[in-house]
Each structure stands twice: as C-alpha cells, then as structure tokens.
Amino acid sequence: MKQVSLVGDVGGTNARLALCDLETGSISHSLTYSGLDYPSLEAVVRVYLDQQSLRIEQACIGIACPIDGDQVSMTNHSWAFSIKQMQENLGLKKLTIINDFTAVSMAIPVLGADDKVQLGGGLARSGKPIAVYGAGTGLGVAHLVQSCDRWLSLPGEGGHVDMASCTEQEDALIQQLRLELGHVSAERLLSGPGLVNIYKGLVTSDHRVPEILTPKQISDRALSGECHDCHRALSLFCVLMGRFAGNLALNLGTFGGVYIAGGLVPRFLEFFKASGFREAFADKGRFKEHLEAIPVYVITHSQPGLLGAGAYLRQSLGITL
C-alpha cells in the first residue's frame, strides 16, 4: 500500500497542502486555501484532511517566517502557533515545520529538466553551493550545499538585508522610499508589494502623483505597453533582481547555480529574459567574469515548495534524494 504524508507551503497569502508519496516523492491532491479565510494553520490542515478522508502520521510544512524553536509567528500573516501543540492536536507522530525557502531549496535536487529555464552562464558545477531566492508576497532566500549523499539547506532571512543603489535613478528611488518606510530592505523592492513601491517611488521622484495599482496591474500594463511608468517599474524590478542575485552568488561562490522561485517572475518570463537582469547580475566590477560563468535558472515547476517539503521529509527518514 502506498505510504503518503502531508506536505504544505504556507505564504503570506495562501496555504497550499498536498500529499507526498514517500517512495517516489511525487506530489498529488494539491489544494490551495486563502489564509484570510481561516483562523489558524491547524484549521486549514483539518479541512484538508477531512476532504481527503485520510489519517496522516507525518507532515512537513514550509512557512514564510524564521523557524527557531517551538513557537512559530508568521512575518506577513497573523497566524502563530506551537509546533508541539499543533502536532498533538492533529494526532501526528511527526510534524516538521521549516522555512518556506528551506523547502524550495530542497526541491532543487529533484527538479526535472523541464522544471527550470536557464538564463545565461555556463554549466552548473556538481558539488558547489547553490543559491535560491524568490519574490512573492515577500522575498525568500536560502542556500543549498551537498555533503556526501545528503543535501543541507542553509536558511536565513536574506530578504531583509539593506538594499543598496548603484545608479542615480536607484539613489532617487531608495531615498524616496526611505522617507516613507525608514529602513529599505531588499524585500521592500523585490516582492509583489515591492513592485508597487518601485512604481510609486519612480513616479513620485518625478514630482507626479502615482495611480493606485496592484502588482498584477503594473505588470499587465507594462507587458501590454500601455503605461510607460509601469514598464519602467517592471524593468527596474528585473535589474534589481539581477543585482541581488549577483550578491548571493558572491556570498557563497554559488557555482552550482542561482535559482529564482516565487510567484512573480514566471508571470512575465519572456520580459524577464529580455530585461537587464543578466547584465546586472554580472555587474560586479573586477568580479564580472567570475559572475558571468555562474548559471541562473528560473524554476518553472508549479509547486516547488510542496515538492521540496516532501524531499526534506523523505531525506529526514533516511531516503537518498
């Protein structure tokens, strides 16, 4: 009989739950729930398990917040809980809660050739460190290294580092955002809300009044060519994504590749390919050639967080990925 476990990917907007086949790692019965519709993560899990009519003994859930100890409090959501208490309440033998980008990073070793698109650089070097980051409701970051036959994810909160500027345009943008926000982290620019901040900052720094637009409206207007300011904002977003990725690559010498996840970039992949992303990625002065050799991939798998949560759980049970 097939043995399955519960896996989850919980962000600031949605909670995705699915079943993972422990033998093959395949993901099935995926459902998405709005975080606004439920008082707690436990409530969402109960609804999902009732819908599947299954009793599950093990679960691994990636959540968009730092994981340090038993108490979990989400960064971009009001949910907070005790891991131990939730495990007891759900009657689980094993409940593992990990950072959402720990989960995404653990998907990388099990991605298929059709699950990613390469954007420049050479061949990924086996055994070398890997970086992964992604823009969605927030900005997630992790690194991945291989030790013998095990993969080790290095979680962190890299999305909250200071955002530096490299041009006069970026100087003006960050200065404008600093007046509004105080501390300007990378996440304040490289996320869905960040795209809105870029748009507002560019227009305001030109002494004009910006429209009230959503991230999707900005990207749609940019792609259709109907709004010059939206096009400017999306173009600069791509450049800043490149600068940030180049910093990640330098931090750990990620000759295993830099991977882009998250819900934003796949929506405008062709625009992203043609943007200034790759030039900005390698724009590191004396280390330009160093960066030009490093491959960058956009993850196109629809659910890397679920896939990676399953991989993390399977490896913790002694299964080689």
Swiss-Prot record:
Gene Ontology cellular component annotations, sorted alphabetically: cytosol
The entry's keywords: ATP-binding, Cytoplasm, Glycolysis, Kinase, Nucleotide-binding, Transferase
InterPro entries (UniProt xref): ATPase_NBD, Bacterial_glucokinase, Glucokinase
Catalyzed reactions: D-glucose + ATP = D-glucose 6-phosphate + ADP + H(+)
Subcellular location: Cytoplasm
Keyword Aminoacyl-tRNA synthetase: no
Record CDD domains: ASKHA_NBD_GLK
Family label: Belongs to the bacterial glucokinase family.
Cross-referenced HAMAP family: Glucokinase
Protein name: Glucokinase
Organism: Psychromonas ingrahamii (strain DSM 17664 / CCUG 51855 / 37)
Lineage: Bacteria, Pseudomonadati, Pseudomonadota, Gammaproteobacteria, Alteromonadales
Gene designation per UniProt: glk
